[in-house]
Amino acid sequence: MADLLFEIGAEEIPAGFVPGALRQLEDDLSKALADARLAHGEVRSVGTPRRLAVWARDVAPKQTDARTEAFGPPVAQAYDAEGKPTPAATGFARSQGVEVSALVRAQTPKGERVAVTKVEKGRRAEQVLPALLERLVGGLRFRKAMRSRFDEATFARPVRWMVALLGGRPLKVRHGEVTSGKVTYGHRFLAPKAIALKGTPDDYLAKLRRAHVLADPVERRAALLAELARAGKEAAGKVRDDPALVEQVLYLVEEPTAVVGEFEKSNLELPPEVVISEMRNHQRYFAVVDGKGRLKNRFVAVSATRVKDPAVARHGYERVLRARLADARFFFEEDRKRRLHERIEDLGRRTFQAKLGSELDRAQRIGAVASALARALGKDALVADLLEASRLAKVDLNTGMVGEFPELQGTMGAHYARLEGLKPEIADAIEDHYKPIGAAEELPRSDLGALVAVADRLHSLVGIIGVGEKATGAADPFGLRRSAIGILRIVIARGYHLSLAAAVEQTLDALSGVKLAAGRAVVAEQVLDFLRGRVRAAWTERFDADLVEAVLAAGSDDVVDARRRLEALADAKARPDFGSLAVAFKRVANIQEKAGGSGAAAVDPALLRDAAEKDLLAALEKVEQEVVARRAARDYPAVLRTVATLEPAVARFFDGVLVMAEDPALRANRLGLMRRVAALFSDLADFRKIQAEAPAQARAG
């Protein structure tokens, strides 16, 4: 057994590319070794901006032999009456590269056939691995890649060296102009000389560590966090928690060194979000806060190179930030010379989307949709504030501050609203209507912000789809998936029992002046189908797919209600008796489907002949009222528990009663009984879509 070590050295790879490339290297090498029939131990990848490396411990010295069996024509066709091979047999043998005498007879599900067994002898690992590693590096995918001027090989950035060692012995691997060797390189400035490697992961990590490179992201993260903690104390505070920035800086440096800097206290008069945004988004600096979480006029920058005189580095960092904050202060002071209401008309000169008009049109439609949603929820008292918040929601797009810091849209509008003395609820709504930004981001704080947020996303979703634009598997330039997910998250989190179909219709009303690419009904169905697709995708990440399909088939117009039904059904499925219940109700639903909804009659007790059907009616009458009450309260766990008490009676009914009797009156009466049973659960879930079996003892019984 020997360790395989493979490293790709390159010019600085963008930080966002590195984690995905490391995951791909690890996954692809594991799969490639398995496909190559090379046994191995741990596979792990490590990397920095200048190198991507992966190793496999304890690689077998040789492939295992591959045994394959190919089946040919039936024996009756392969040999004639005298037992001599026919052209069919000789042709099959020739296609397999063997003599006809090597054919054997084998029993298959399709009868006795001729077959040939071939054994491919395993090759030595050093013969197999070079080509395998060349495919590995060539298969790495990046959002953007560069091509050498001398060949067609591509990579995130120009490849400068490669290392490929098996048990310390070099393998010849080529990518473009670069051929692998057995030396790597340390820190670009602190240890640029070649470093000979023994080929083991431990040797690799240790030698690079001495050369000022922490190749292992786990070790580098710990060092980075320690440096940030040290610098925070030096700055008489602590570094503001920012996991996303930590992750980014982690792949910007090979050896982190924190430097504490300072900026003018007067800049603390700016909104904290402005200062933080400038530091983190533009300079990759960490903000420093005091014990109460208030921003201090200090920052921490992380250098990739430890310098002899930190004061020189500090001065450089401070100089860059000082200029940026001066610009921010200028924009802030200029913006405040005009009130938000004075900027509303400016939105008419800003295009939202060519076919949907201006940002002013958009704001007016958002207000109309938000008001309609509020009335549908019985929140009429919010309408006046909703119209005001909608008018002002996009106004800050025309401010100098948002022009310079686009990520602060909404945030700056809220700050300006508070400074002007507008209602705090309206200021919060201006900020919150952009939330959630991502799948795990925080949600709007109030109904006001939530309804403007939903209306904004509905307008985008219905409007963009309405004018003929679509999200494809490869691209979503208008953020339609993000809009749909945002709608669903807000509606579910706030428990809004909204009709999605009605909400789409209300949005189409607001878009009445827009020329649609298809008929109104077609657009509405396209939007609802898109929303259902997002619901399905989101819920199947947590719940069994069959349960999701069952619930959606029973209705998803009210997603809050559908989610409650799904959670109740998932809890019920975890119980040991669920299989019998699901099978019984599936039979009920199947009979209803076969009957096509016709032929059923109101149940006449006088026509009940068998004890099993009489017992079922009695059991039904005991639970129907309770189910109606529980369902009205949306207490779906209780509904399912109550309905489950019918399972024994339903099972006995199917065992002893012929539903589709020849007598039309009996058949109609029994179908009516099935219809009443189905009515108890048909609007909860379509049990026909649930994958479940009755317990073995129940089937045997």
From Swiss-Prot:
GO terms for molecular function: arginine-tRNA ligase activity; ATP binding; glycine-tRNA ligase activity. It is an enzyme of class 6 (ligase). It is found in: Cytoplasm. It catalyses: tRNA(Gly) + glycine + ATP = glycyl-tRNA(Gly) + AMP + diphosphate. Its EC number is 6.1.1.14. Keywords: Aminoacyl-tRNA synthetase, ATP-binding, Cytoplasm, Ligase, Nucleotide-binding, Protein biosynthesis. Pfam families: DALR_1 (PF05746), tRNA_synt_2f (PF02092). GO terms for biological process: arginyl-tRNA aminoacylation; glycyl-tRNA aminoacylation. GO terms for cellular component: cytosol. InterPro entries: DALR_anticod-bd, Gly-tRNA-synth_bsu, Gly-tRNA-synth_heterodimer. Its main location: cytoplasm. The keyword Protein biosynthesis applies. Belongs to the class-II aminoacyl-tRNA synthetase family. Tetramer of two alpha and two beta subunits. This is Glycine--tRNA ligase beta subunit. It comes from Anaeromyxobacter dehalogenans (strain 2CP-1 / ATCC BAA-258).
